[in-house]
C-alpha cells in the first residue's frame, strides 16, 4: 500500500480516491496533499499560491461586476430598491451615487460604470491569476525576493501583515475622501427625508469615537452599532484608517517581540486560522450593523429595520385614529396601558402596544416628533408631515421578516406584501458565514497547534472502507 502519511512534518496527507491521478505534475506523493486539498498543495510554492489568490480575487470581482450589471438591467425606478431584491445597488446608493432627495434614484449610469469597471478589473486579475498559476515561476524567493517568503520567517510575516494593514487604511480613507470631497454620501437624517451631502464637520474627538467601543451592547446602548450620525461614521474611518496605516508601518519596521514569538504559532495553517477568526468577527459585527443600524444602511435602500417597521405600524394607526377623532394622549388599550402612547422604564413617552419593546428606536421620520421627554403630544397632534406618514406606511408593510417562501412582513400586519428584505438577506448571510468561518478558525487553529506540538499525523485511515473499493476510473 502507498504511504498514507507524508514524511514532511506538519503536512498531514489525505488519501487519494485514485492513486494514479496527478494534476499538473503535483500528485500526492510529491506534495503531501491529495488533489482535492486545493491550495494546500501549493503551500510551499509561493508563485503558484500567488496565482491562486489573484485568480480568486478575479472571481470575486467578476461576480461583483456581473451581479452589478444584472441588478442595473432589472432595476425599476418606480419601486424602492428593497422591494426588488437588490443587494449591491443599495451599497452604491448609500455612497451617494445616482440618488437625490428622499433616496430617489435619478441616474443609473454610475451603477453601470461600476459594473463595467469591476468586469474589466476581473479580466486583469484573471489574466494575472492564470499567468502565475500556469506560466510564472513556481517560487518567488529566487527571482523576486521581496515577494518571496517562508512561513516560519516571523519578520517577513509581520511585514506582510503591515502591508495588509496599510491597504486597509487606504480603503478607509477612500470613504473619507468620497464623503468630504467627491460628491458626499447619502445621509438618511438630512432634513425632509434624506439627501446626498458632503460631510463638513467630522467627529474626531477620541472620547466620542472610542466611547462607542465602551458602550454596552444591550438595550438602548447598542455598542458601535448604535451610531446614528454620519459625522461620527466618517470620523471613525479617519481614526480607523490612521490606526491601520500607523500599525502597518509599525509592523513593517519592527520585529515581533519575544512574548509574541512565544505566544503565536508561526505556520501557514496558523495564519489561515487567524484570518478566518478575524473574518468571523467581521461577519458577526456586520450582521448586527445591517440588522439594527439605519444610518450606515439607510432604510430607503435596504428597507426598514425590524424595530422601525414595528414602530411605523404604531405610528400609522395613531395617525389614522387621530384623524377619526381618537384622543391618542389618553386612550387606553385592553391591558389598561396607553393604547397609542405610554411611558418607557425611564419615563419617556413612547408608542404603546406591542411595539413598546422597541421604544429606543431612532429613525429620521420619527425623531422630529420627539421632545425632551420622548414623543411630544403637541407635535403628534399638529406637526406630522405627509412625508412622515408616507414613509411609515411604506415601512409598516415591508418589515424585514420574510421567510424562504417570500411571505414578508409583520404577522399582525394584513397589508404586508410578499417580499424578502435585503436587510434580512444581508444580516442572515453574514451571520451564517461568520459562524462557518468561526468553525474553520477552530479547525485550522487546532491542526496548527497540534502540528507545532509535533503530534499532527493526519486521520488514521487504515480501516477506511474506500481503500478496499474499486477506483472510479
Swiss-Prot record:
It is found in: Plastid, Chloroplast thylakoid membrane. It is a multi-pass membrane protein. GO terms for molecular function: chlorophyll binding; electron transporter, transferring electrons within the cyclic electron transport pathway of photosynthesis activity; metal ion binding. Binds multiple chlorophylls and provides some of the ligands for the Ca-4Mn-5O cluster of the oxygen-evolving complex. It may also provide a ligand for a Cl- that is required for oxygen evolution. PSII binds additional chlorophylls, carotenoids and specific lipids. Keywords: Acetylation, Chlorophyll, Chloroplast, Chromophore, Manganese, Membrane, Metal-binding, Phosphoprotein, Photosynthesis, Photosystem II, Plastid, Thylakoid, Transmembrane, Transmembrane helix. The modification N-acetylthreonine is found at residue 15. PSII is composed of 1 copy each of membrane proteins PsbA, PsbB, PsbC, PsbD, PsbE, PsbF, PsbH, PsbI, PsbJ, PsbK, PsbL, PsbM, PsbT, PsbX, PsbY, PsbZ, Psb30/Ycf12, at least 3 peripheral proteins of the oxygen-evolving complex and a large number of cofactors. It forms dimeric complexes. This is Photosystem II CP43 reaction center protein.
Amino acid at each position: 500500500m502507498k504511504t498514507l502519511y507524508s514524511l514532511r512534518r506538519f503536512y498531514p496527507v489525505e488519501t487519494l480516491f485514485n492513486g494514479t491521478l496527478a494534476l499538473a505534475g503535483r500528485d500526492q506523493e510529491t506534495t503531501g496533499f491529495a488533489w482535492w486539498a486545493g491550495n494546500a498543495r501549493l503551500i510551499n510554492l509561493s508563485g503558484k499560491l500567488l496565482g491562486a489568490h489573484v485568480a480568486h480575487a478575479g472571481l470575486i470581482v467578476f461576480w461583483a461586476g456581473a451581479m452589478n450589471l444584472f441588478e442595473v438591467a432589472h432595476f425599476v425606478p418606480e419601486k424602492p430598491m428593497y422591494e426588488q431584491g437588490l443587494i449591491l445597488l443599495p451599497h452604491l446608493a448609500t455612497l451617494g451615487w445616482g440618488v437625490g432627495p428622499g433616496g430617489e434614484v435619478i441616474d443609473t449610469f454610475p451603477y453601470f460604470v461600476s459594473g463595467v469597471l469591476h468586469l474589466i478589473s476581473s479580466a486583469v486579475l484573471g489574466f494575472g491569476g492564470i499567468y502565475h498559476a500556469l506560466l510564472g515561476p513556481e517560487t518567488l524567493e529566487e527571482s523576486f525576493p521581496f515577494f518571496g517568503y517562508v512561513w516560519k520567517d516571523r519578520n517577513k510575516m509581520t511585514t506582510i501583515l503591515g502591508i495588509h494593514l496599510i491597504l486597509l487604511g487606504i480603503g478607509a480613507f477612500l470613504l473619507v475622501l468620497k464623503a468630504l470631497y467627491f460628491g458626499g454620501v447619502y445621509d438618511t437624517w438630512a432634513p425632509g427625508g434624506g439627501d446626498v451631502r458632503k460631510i463638513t464637520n467630522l467627529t474626531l474627538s477620541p472620547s466620542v469615537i472610542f466611547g462607542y467601543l465602551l458602550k454596552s451592547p444591550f438595550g438602548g446602548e447598542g455598542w458601535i452599532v448604535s451610531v446614528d450620525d454620519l459625522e461620527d461614521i466618517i470620523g471613525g474611518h479617519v481614526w480607523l484608517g490612521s490606526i491601520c496605516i500607523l500599525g502597518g508601518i509599525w509592523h513593517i519596521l519592527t520585529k515581533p517581540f519575544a512574548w509574541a514569538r512565544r505566544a503565536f504559532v508561526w505556520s501557514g495553517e496558523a495564519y489561515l486560522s487567524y484570518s478566518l477568526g478575524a473574518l468571523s468577527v467581521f461577519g458577526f459585527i456586520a450582521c448586527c450593523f445591517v440588522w439594527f443600524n439605519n444610518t450606515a444602511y439607510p432604510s430607503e435602500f435596504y428597507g426598514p429595520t425590524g424595530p422601525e417597521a414595528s414602530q411605523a405600524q404604531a405610528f400609522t394607526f395613531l395617525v389614522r385614529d387621530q384623524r377619526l377623532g381618537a384622543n391618542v394622549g389618553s386612550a387606553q388599550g385592553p391591558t389598561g396601558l396607553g393604547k397609542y402612547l405610554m411611558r418607557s422604564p425611564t419615563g419617556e413617552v413612547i408608542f404603546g402596544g406591542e411595539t413598546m419593546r422597541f421604544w429606543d428606536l431612532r429613525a429620521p421620520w420619527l425623531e422630529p416628533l420627539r421632545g425632551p421627554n420622548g414623543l411630544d403630544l403637541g407635535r403628534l397632534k399638529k406637526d406630522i408631515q405627509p412625508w412622515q406618514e408616507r414613509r411609515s406606511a411604506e415601512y409598516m408593510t415591508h418589515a424585514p421578516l420574510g421567510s424562504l417562501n417570500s411571505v414578508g412582513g409583520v404577522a399582525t400586519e394584513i397589508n404586508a406584501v410578499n417580499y424578502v428584505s435585503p436587510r434580512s438577506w444581508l444580516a442572515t448571510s453574514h451571520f451564517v458565514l461568520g459562524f462557518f468561518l468561526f468553525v474553520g478558525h477552530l479547525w485550522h487553529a487546532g491542526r496548527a497547534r497540534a502540528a507545532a506540538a509535533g503530534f499532527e499525523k493526519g486521520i488514521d485511515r487504515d480501516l477506511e472502507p474506500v481503500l478496499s473499493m474499486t477506483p472510479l476510473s
